[in-house]
Regions:
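Active-site rim helix/loop that mediates acceptor-substrate recognition in acyltransferases
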Residues: 39-69, 73, 77-83, 98-99
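Conserved active-site alpha-helix within GNAT-family acetyltransferase domains
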Residues: 126-127, 147-175
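Short hydrophobic/aromatic beta-strand element in the GNAT-like acyltransferase core
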Residues: 60-64, 75, 107, 112, ...
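Conserved acetyl-CoA-binding loop-helix of GNAT-fold acetyltransferases
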Residues: 110-117, 121-134, 154-158
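Acyl-donor-binding surface of acyltransferase catalytic domains
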Residues: 1-13, 80-86, 90-91
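A short beta-loop-alpha structural element at the N-terminal edge
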Residues: 12-31, 39-42
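Conserved acyl-donor/pantetheine-binding loop and adjacent beta-alpha core of acyl/acetyltransferases
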Residues: 77-112, 170-173
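Conserved GNAT acetyl-CoA-binding A-motif
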Residues: 134-147
């Protein structure tokens, strides 16, 4: 398991990144997501069913960043992409318009990556996504993020992700997304 040393002035705790039984800790993970992403209880209830369904997909894996007391500070999960999955069916036309729909084949999708705000900016997100993709067995990774200049998009760019399609509209999402892709392994900095 990877250890992230804490900055004594900003983060007195050490986070450990390792396998996460996301099905068993789904409520705790979604609490982190709700705080980090600003979603309400109704949306959390919808996402709970989605997460549990995703965990049944072949190759789905999850990692968590935990404090020494076992508290979940962040999590990531993903799976090998399947063109038949809802996400792929939504982004395919946007990727095709940019000549990038080939990225839907042979890619590992980062489905969710969230770090509690108290632990953001300290390497937990970078450690989670890098550890997950390091052992996915595929040559590239794709993800979607809200299409704005944000710490998340800056993190992804620093890891080698580039825009494959922008202004992607998901049903019921209030803001457009960008689909990003990167060759694996992700660079270390």
């Amino acid at each position: 398991m990877a250890r992230l040393p804490g900055d004594r002035t900003r983060n007195p705790e050490h986070l450990t990144i390792g396998p996460l039984d996301l099905a068993a800790r789904v409520d705790e993970a979604l609490e982190v997501q709700a705080i980090a992403f600003g979603i309400g209880a109704e949306e959390v209830a919808v996402r709970r069913h989605i997460v549990l369904r995703h965990l049944d997909c072949p190759g789905a894996r999850a990692l968590g960043a935990t404090t020494p007391t076992g508290r979940l500070a962040g999590f990531v999960y993903g799976m090998p992409n399947n063109r038949g999955h809802w996400w792929s069916t939504v982004v395919e036309s946007y990727l095709r318009a940019q000549g990038n729909d080939g990225w839907l084949d042979g890619s590992f999708v980062i489905t969710e990556l969230h770090v509690h705000p108290a632990y953001q900016g300290r390497g937990a997100g970078r450690g989670l996504i890098s550890a997950l993709t390091d052992t996915c067995g595929l040559d590239r990774s794709i993800l979607s993020a809200i299409d704005t200049d944000s710490p998340a998009r800056r993190l992804y760019r620093s890891l080698g992700y580039t825009d494959l399609a922008r202004q992607v509209l998901f049903p019921s999402a209030p803001r457009p997304y960008a689909v990003m892709g990167a060759p694996l392994p992700l660079p270390r900095s």
